[in-house]
A protein has these predicted regions:
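Conserved MFS/SLC helix-loop-helix module at the cytosolic interface between two early adjacent transmembrane helices
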Residues: 55-93
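Helix-to-loop junctions at the C-terminal end of transmembrane segments
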Residues: 56-68, 254-266, 350
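Paired small-residue
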Residues: 83, 94-102, 291-299
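Cytoplasmic helix-loop-helix junction between adjacent transmembrane helices
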Residues: 93, 99-137
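Intracellular juxtamembrane helix-capping segments at the cytosolic ends
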Residues: 109-122, 306-320
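Helix-loop-helix hairpin linking two adjacent transmembrane segments in secondary transporters
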Residues: 124-125, 133-179, 183
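Extracytoplasmic gate region of multi-pass secondary transporters
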Residues: 203-245
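A late C-terminal transmembrane helix in Major Facilitator Superfamily
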Residues: 316-354
Length: 383
C-alpha cells in the first residue's frame, strides 16, 4: 500500500503541469472587470506563465545546484497555490501580471522534477508504465481544473483562480508518501556537479528538436481545427470543441497503451508514432467531411501523446542519473519553444497560403522527416 501511495503521489505532480490555460474561460469576466485595459493585455495573463516556465527551465541547472529536488518540488507546489489566492487578495492588474509569471516559474520547477523523479525511482517495465500513466495524469488534470473553473466562475473571476489550490493536497501527498532519506540526499549531492558530455548534449538537443516539432504540430492542430471544421463540415465552434476535447482525452488511452507499444516497437516507437502523427496531419488537411476530420484528429491526439512520452523515455534510457534532470529540462524547453513558435510559423505559412491542405501538409511532412531524425538520434546515442 505504501508503494502504491508513493507512486500516486509522484504521478499527482504531473496532474497540474499543463493547467496554465485552465482559467481561460474566465477571460470574459476579466474583460469586464479591467475596463480601459486592452483585451490583448488581458489575454496575455492566460499565456504569460509560459514565460515563467521558460525562465525556470533555462536556469534549471543552476537552480539544481542551490536546491535539492525535494526543495524545488515543495517550493513549486507552494508558489503554485499562493498564486491562485493572489487575485482574491489584490486583483490589481500589475499584481496579477506578476503572479502569473511566478506561477509559470513554479510550474517550470515542477515540470522537470515530475518527469525526472519517475526515471530516478523506477526502472525497466515499471518505469515505462509509470511514464505512460504520467501523460494520462496531465490530461485528466487539465480537464478537472478546467471544469473546476467553470464551477467557480459564478462566484467571480477571482474565485476561478482558486482551482490552483489543488496543489495543497498534492503537496501533502508528496511530503507524506514520497520518502527522502539520507541516501537520496547523498546521491543528489554526488550528482550535483556532474556535467553533460558533448555526446549527451547532442542527444538532448536532438530530442529537444523532436519534442519542439511534436508540440508545434499539436498547437497548430488545436488552433486551426475550429476553422477547418467550419470549412469542411459546416460545423460550429461547439463541434470543434467536442473534437478537440476528444483529441485531448484520447491521451489517457495513449498513456495506458504506452508500455505495450514500447515492448512491441522498442527503439522504433519514436519513428512509428512520429510518422503516424505526420500522416494524421496530412489527412486532416485533405479531409472532405466532418466524420473523417474528427477521426483523424482524435488519432492525431493519440499519436502525439505516444510520441512525446517516447522522447522522455528515450532520455531516461540514454542519460545517466547525474545529468538526467538537466537533459529533461532541455527537452521540456524544446516543448515550450515549439509552443511559442506556433504563432510565427502559422503567420509565415499564411503569407503563402492559409488552405488546410497546405498548412497541415507542411506540418505533416515536417513531422515525418523529424521522426526519422529522431530514429537516428536514438540509434546513435544507443551505441
Amino acid at each position: 500500500m505504501k508503494k502504491i501511495m508513493e507512486k500516486v503521489s509522484i504521478l499527482a505532480l504531473s496532474f497540474i503541469l499543463t493547467t496554465s490555460f485552465s482559467i481561460s474561460s474566465a477571460q470574459s469576466a476579466m474583460f469586464a472587470y479591467y475596463r480601459g485595459i486592452p483585451h490583448s493585455m488581458i489575454e496575455l495573463l492566460v499565456s504569460l506563465p509560459s514565460a515563467g516556465i521558460m525562465v525556470s527551465l533555462i536556469f534549471n541547472k543552476w537552480i539544481g545546484r542551490l536546491f535539492s529536488e525535494r526543495q524545488m518540488i515543495v517550493t513549486g507546489l507552494v508558489a503554485y497555490a499562493l498564486c491562485g489566492f493572489i487575485p482574491l487578495i489584490s486583483p490589481a492588474y500589475p499584481v496579477v501580471f506578476l503572479s502569473r509569471i511566478i506561477f509559470g516559474m513554479a510550474v517550470g520547477l515542477l515540470n522537470v522534477s515530475a518527469i525526472a523523479i519517475i526515471s530516478e525511482r523506477y526502472k525497466g517495465k515499471e518505469r515505462v508504465q509509470t511514464l505512460g500513466i504520467r501523460g494520462s495524469a496531465e490530461v485528466v488534470g487539465t480537464a478537472v481544473l478546467t471544469f473546476g473553473v467553470s464551477l467557480l466562475i459564478r462566484f467571480g473571476w477571482q474565485a476561478a483562480f482558486l482551482v490552483y489550490g489543488i496543489s495543497i493536497p498534492i503537496l501533502l501527498l508528496y511530503l507524506l508518501f514520497v520518502p527522502y532519506g539520507s541516501m537520496t540526499e547523498a546521491v543528489e549531492e554526488k550528482h550535483r556537479d556532474v556535467k553533460m558530455t558533448g555526446e549527451q548534449w547532442r542527444t538532448a538537443l536532438g530530442l529537444a528538436v523532436v519534442a519542439a516539432s511534436i508540440v508545434l504540430s499539436n498547437v497548430m492542430i488545436t488552433v486551426r481545427i475550429p476553422s477547418v471544421v467550419e470549412q469542411v463540415g459546416h460545423g460550429t465552434a461547439q463541434t470543434a470543441g467536442i473534437i478537440l476535447a476528444a483529441m485531448q482525452f484520447v491521451g489517457i488511452l495513449a498513456g495506458l497503451a504506452f508500455s505495450p507499444l514500447t515492448q512491441l516497437f522498442r527503439d522504433r516507437l519514436l519513428v512509428v508514432s512520429g510518422v503516424a502523427y505526420g500522416l494524421t496531419q496530412l489527412l486532416i488537411g485533405v479531409s472532405t467531411n466532418l466524420w473523417m476530420l474528427a477521426i483523424v484528429t482524435i488519432l492525431a491526439g493519440f499519436a502525439y501523446s505516444v510520441a512525446l512520452t517516447t522522447v522522455y523515455n528515450v532520455l531516461s534510457d540514454q542519460m545517466p542519473a547525474g545529468v538526467l534532470s538537466q537533459a529533461t529540462s532541455i527537452a521540456v524547453l524544446g516543448c515550450s519553444a515549439g509552443s511559442i513558435a506556433t504563432t510565427f510559423v502559422l503567420s509565415l505559412l499564411g503569407t503563402i497560403s492559409s488552405a488546410p491542405a497546405f498548412i497541415f501538409g507542411f506540418s505533416g511532412i515536417l513531422m515525418i522527416l523529424i521522426s526519422f531524425f529522431g530514429l537516428w538520434i536514438v540509434r546513435k546515442s544507443g551505441k
